[in-house]
Each structure stands twice: as C-alpha cells, then as structure tokens.
Amino acid sequence: AYPDARPAQLRGWHRLWVRIEGAAHVFLSVLPEEGTVIDGLIAAVPGADWVALDTRETNYDRIGSNGAVVHDIIPAPDMAHYSVPTDTHVTSGDHTILLSYLDVVVQGFLREYGIDGVQRFFDTTRGWDTPILNDRAAPKYPRAQELTAQETALVDQHLPRLSAQVQ
C-alpha cells in the first residue's frame, strides 16, 4: 500500500487480463488504444526505488506515461505505468484469473472510485472469457486482502453479467 496514492486516469490505453507462457494465472495489464480512458491510481515510488518496483512487477515492462495520466499534481512529476509485453502474451492455455486477485483490485476501485468506479472497472476490462479460479478459501494471490461481505457481494454480482465462469 502506498500512503500517498491518489486517483488518476490513463488516456489511450485499455485494461485486459493477459496470459503469459509459464504462468498458471493471468495478469492484469494495459495495451495502447486510441480514444480510451481507464481509472487507476498514482503514487510515489517508495524511496524512489524503481529497481525494487521493477523486481516486484517482474512480468511487466515499465513505460513512460508521457502525459497520458490525468491527475491533480502540480507540477507534474515524471510518471510511468506497467504493461505485460505483447511478445509474452499467449492466446490459449489453462490460465485462470485468481478470484483473490480480482477481489483486491475491486476492493481498491471501491475505496477510490465508489460503486460507479467498480462498474467502470468491469466495463473497461477485457478478457472476462478467461475462467476465474475461486481461491478465496486459500488465496494464491500473494497480496490477498480480507473483504467485507459487501465487497465480496459486489465482486460476485458483476461476474454473471460478464458471463464470467467461476471454477
């Protein structure tokens, strides 16, 4: 968690679940697309230690945002976002979305953007045809969080609307 995180939007990129070779589970990523805007967060990198963040985000490339981030910081600092390189994407396999990962993402969107933000997250994210592994009883996502009953219900209510398959 970053204490100085704040809401922001990323212009010209869309969000999607991506499969990569050698991983059992998919990753949430972004790809360039003209005319799109997605919600997210910005935060200072603790201790400006980009190497540590790059190590944590090992399957992602750090990309300079070059003014694509809409935010309220003046003067605007240099910013970057992370994307899984397209040359590592695979289109088939037994990959799954970890429900514990999705839960954490939705919990964050709810806290930062409210119910409407959660709706926008589901609506602006692609790849819901990937099966979802219900690992809530024994989370496999390393940064899993405990959700309230209301947060869990919010996640669960969106999945049928997207024809998502929970295993």
Residue ranges and their predicted role:
Residues 1-167:
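A glycine-rich, hydrophobic/aromatic-adjacent loop/helix-cap motif
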